[in-house]
């Protein structure tokens, strides 16, 4: 069993999509950084690695047995044993996992660049461990509240968060089935479409707005998001939290 020592982690909890587990350059000053005193390192095949990185599903039982009680976290000068905590790589990607006692990867973190480099060197000539696990034959279903990586590609942490907030607001708008309201919002998005949307039904306008909003991120997206969340306390709070961030 390979081990890493003094590993800095920034846990992202309950993230099923790897793109929301931020790389080191996107970590923020107010993120909670923890120190793993010791953590086992596993090399697995790419199928299992992507399953762990991009799902919140059961981990192979044998993998859990292999890492059981082998990691320690350093907290307030104490060395605390962790139930199931490990770093996993396929030789290309790297992610740290803490199940907080469950059998699914509840908490995920990237590593700092120096430690990523160390992982690549340590596993370079190591065979991948074979673990049996049930992988669904169907392709993972992405939807408005769990967007495809292609929809998030190339965006900063702040842009991803705001785009997900925009999608949450659009999803809520969909439940209203209010044709006059969706016509208003589409015209806000694209003033030149005013005449066209007067002759369209709710579902068609909503689908067109969602489809167009999926592409990239721009000032236009940001303005629509800000206007849509206005007057909705929960969404407004999320908006304010992201806009307190000057970078990322």
Curated annotation (Swiss-Prot):
Superkingdom assignment: Bacteria
Protein name according to UniProt: UPF0736 protein BCE33L1074
Lineage: Bacteria, Bacillati, Bacillota, Bacilli, Bacillales
Record organism: Bacillus cereus (strain ZK / E33L)
One protein family per Pfam: DUF3603
Family classification: Belongs to the UPF0736 family.
């Amino acid at each position: 069993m390979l081990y890493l020592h003094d590993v800095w982690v920034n846990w992202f909890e309950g993230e099923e999509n790897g793109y929301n587990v931020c790389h080191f350059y996107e970590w923020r000053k107010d993120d909670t950084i923890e120190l793993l005193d010791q953590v086992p390192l596993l090399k697995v095949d790419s199928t299992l690695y992507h399953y762990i990185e991009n799902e919140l599903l059961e981990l192979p039982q044998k993998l859990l047995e292999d890492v059981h009680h082998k990691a320690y976290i350093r907290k307030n000068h104490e060395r605390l044993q962790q139930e199931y905590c490990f770093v996993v790589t396929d030789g290309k990607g790297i992610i740290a996992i803490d199940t907080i006692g469950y059998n699914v990867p509840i908490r995920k973190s990237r590593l700092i660049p120096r430690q990523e480099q160390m992982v690549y060197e340590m596993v370079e000539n190591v065979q991948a461990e074979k673990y049996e696990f049930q992988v669904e034959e169907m392709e993972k279903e992405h939807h408005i509240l769990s967007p495809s990586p292609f929809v998030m590609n190339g965006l900063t942490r702040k842009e991803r968060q705001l785009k997900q907030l925009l999608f949450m607001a659009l999803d809520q708008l969909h439940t209203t089935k209010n044709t006059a309201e969706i016509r208003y919002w589409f015209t806000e998005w694209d003033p030149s479409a005013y005449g066209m949307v007067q002759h369209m039904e709710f579902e068609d306008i909503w689908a067109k707005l969602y489809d167009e909003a999926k592409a990239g991120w721009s000032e236009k997206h940001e303005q629509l998001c800000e206007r849509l969340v206005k007057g909705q306390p929960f969404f407004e709070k999320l908006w304010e939290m992201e806009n307190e961030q000057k970078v990322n």
